[in-house]
Amino acid sequence: MADYQGKNVVIIGLGLTGLSCVDFFLARGVTPRVMDTRMTPPGLDKLPEAVERHTGGLNDEWLMAADLIVASPGIALAHPSLSAAADAGIEIVGDIELFCREAQAPIVAITGSNGKSTVTTLVGEMAKAAGVNVGVGGNIGLPALMLLDDECELYVLELSSFQLETTSSLQAVAATILNVTEDHMDRYPFGLQQYRAAKLRIYENAKVCVVNADDALTMPIRGADERCVSFGVNMGDYHLNHQQGETWLRVKGEKVLNVKEMKLSGQHNYTNALAALALADAAGLPRASSLKALTTFTGLPHRFEVVLEHNGVRWVNDSKATNVGSTEAALNGLHVDGTLHLLLGGDGKSADFSPLARYLNGDNVRLYCFGRDGAQLAALRPEVAEQTETMEQAMRLLATRVQPGDMVLLSPACASLDQFKNFEQRGNEFARLAKELG
C-alpha cells in the first residue's frame, strides 16, 4: 500500500471516477485539488467544500506544482500540459493504478476492442455462482476504487487502453486481450500498433495470459509463452466444436457445454464464453459453477439485444458497436431469412470502414447511414445505401419497407457522441422507435 501523506495531489477529471479518487485521498488524510476541462462537470456539486477546484480548462500552475497527478482516461497523455508535467518528472497515474496498489485480493483483468463488458460481467457471474465475494467494475459499472473492500475475495476489472496507459502495478491472476481492431484512432496518431502497445500492458506481471488464437495482435510482444492459454473459433485450448449440426464449447479436447443450453447466441458470444471460462479456470473458480453461469446469463443491454419481434421482423439493438470490429463481429456468420436493414453511422473516430465491405455484398442487404460519417459509410455500397441526417429519419424510412423474415439491425460501427449523449441513449432511442414503428 502506498503512502500519500504530505503529497500535493491533483486530480484531472470529475464524474464518478474523479469523485472516487477524491474520496480515496480524503480517506487517507490528503486533500487533493481537482480540475476539469468542462465548465460544469458531473459531480461538481458533490465535491466537499475543502477541495479546491478549477473548471473550464486545465490549470498548468497546479499541475507543475504537483507531486502526483491522477489523470482521467478521458485526457490524452500527449496533451501538452501533461507532457510538460511528465518532462518535469511529475508522476502521472490513473485510478486503476491507485486501485492496484491497494487491492489485497486477486484481480482478473480484461481488455479488448470488443466483448470486454460481456466477458467481465460473465466472469463476475461465474464467481457469484461459486459463492465467491466478487467486485466487478472498472471501465463498466462502478469505478475500481469504489470496489475496494477487505471482504472481497476476487476483483474482475474491465480495463480500457486509456486506463492501461497509466497503470504499472497491475499483477493479474489472469489477464486477457480479447481482440484488437481499430478504435480510438483519434487518440493513437501512430496507428494500430500504438493502440495495441497500450493494451499489451495488461500482460505485464500477469500469472496467466488468455490470448485469442484467431488474432495475432492479442499475443504478448515476444509471442506466446508458458503463461499463455488460448481461445478461438476452431483452434486454441478453448474452442468451438461443430458436430451433427450442434455446437459445443470444448476445452483441451473435452466437450463441456452445448451452446443450445446458453441464453447468449451468435458466434462472437460463444467465443466470449470461451474467454470467460478460460479466465475463470485460471482464477481457480470451480468449472461446474462457471458452466452453470453460462446457462443463465442473458447478455447485456445494447449488445446484439433483440428489442422487438413483431410481424415476423426482428429489431436488434447493437448500439454498443462503436467501432468497425464490433460491427464485423455482429455481421460475421449472421443469418437472416429476408432482408437485413443495417443502420450505420455516427462519429467514426478516424477509423477505416473498408473491412465492413465484405459483409455487405449480399442481395439481401440494405444500408441506412446517418450522422457525421454517414456519407463515408454509404460509399461502402452506394447502390443499396440511403443517407439521412439522423437515425430516426433512417428508421422511419426503413419501417415502410420491412417484410416478414427481415431483420433491422442497429450496429453503427461508430461512436454516438455526434448526436447522442452516449451509446446507451442511442440504443434506448432505437428501442423506443422500434416499438413505435414495428
Swiss-Prot record:
<dbReference type="GO" id="GO:0008764">
    <property type="term" value="F:UDP-N-acetylmuramoylalanine-D-glutamate ligase activity"/>
</dbReference>
<dbReference type="GO" id="GO:0009252">
    <property type="term" value="P:peptidoglycan biosynthetic process"/>
</dbReference>
<dbReference type="InterPro" id="IPR004101">
    <property type="entry name" value="Mur_ligase_C"/>
</dbReference>
<dbReference type="InterPro" id="IPR005762">
    <property type="entry name" value="MurD"/>
</dbReference>
<dbReference type="GO" id="GO:0008360">
    <property type="term" value="P:regulation of cell shape"/>
</dbReference>
<keyword id="KW-0963">Cytoplasm</keyword>
<dbReference type="Pfam" id="PF02875">
    <property type="entry name" value="Mur_ligase_C"/>
</dbReference>
<feature type="binding site">
    <location>
        <begin position="112"/>
        <end position="118"/>
    </location>
    <ligand>
        <name>ATP</name>
    </ligand>
</feature>
<comment type="similarity">
    <text>Belongs to the MurCDEF family.</text>
</comment>
<dbReference type="GO" id="GO:0051301">
    <property type="term" value="P:cell division"/>
</dbReference>
<keyword id="KW-0436">Ligase</keyword>
<keyword id="KW-0132">Cell division</keyword>
<keyword id="KW-0131">Cell cycle</keyword>
<dbReference type="Pfam" id="PF21799">
    <property type="entry name" value="MurD-like_N"/>
</dbReference>
<keyword id="KW-0133">Cell shape</keyword>
<dbReference type="GO" id="GO:0005737">
    <property type="term" value="C:cytoplasm"/>
</dbReference>
<keyword id="KW-0961">Cell wall biogenesis/degradation</keyword>
<comment type="function">
    <text>Cell wall formation. Catalyzes the addition of glutamate to the nucleotide precursor UDP-N-acetylmuramoyl-L-alanine (UMA).</text>
</comment>
<comment type="pathway">
    <text>Cell wall biogenesis; peptidoglycan biosynthesis.</text>
</comment>
<keyword id="KW-0547">Nucleotide-binding</keyword>
<dbReference type="InterPro" id="IPR013221">
    <property type="entry name" value="Mur_ligase_cen"/>
</dbReference>
<dbReference type="InterPro" id="IPR036565">
    <property type="entry name" value="Mur-like_cat_sf"/>
</dbReference>
<dbReference type="GO" id="GO:0071555">
    <property type="term" value="P:cell wall organization"/>
</dbReference>
<dbReference type="GO" id="GO:0005524">
    <property type="term" value="F:ATP binding"/>
</dbReference>
<keyword id="KW-0067">ATP-binding</keyword>
<dbReference type="Pfam" id="PF08245">
    <property type="entry name" value="Mur_ligase_M"/>
</dbReference>
<dbReference type="InterPro" id="IPR036615">
    <property type="entry name" value="Mur_ligase_C_dom_sf"/>
</dbReference>
<keyword id="KW-0573">Peptidoglycan synthesis</keyword>
<protein>
    <recommendedName>
        <fullName>UDP-N-acetylmuramoylalanine--D-glutamate ligase</fullName>
        <ecNumber>6.3.2.9</ecNumber>
    </recommendedName>
</protein>
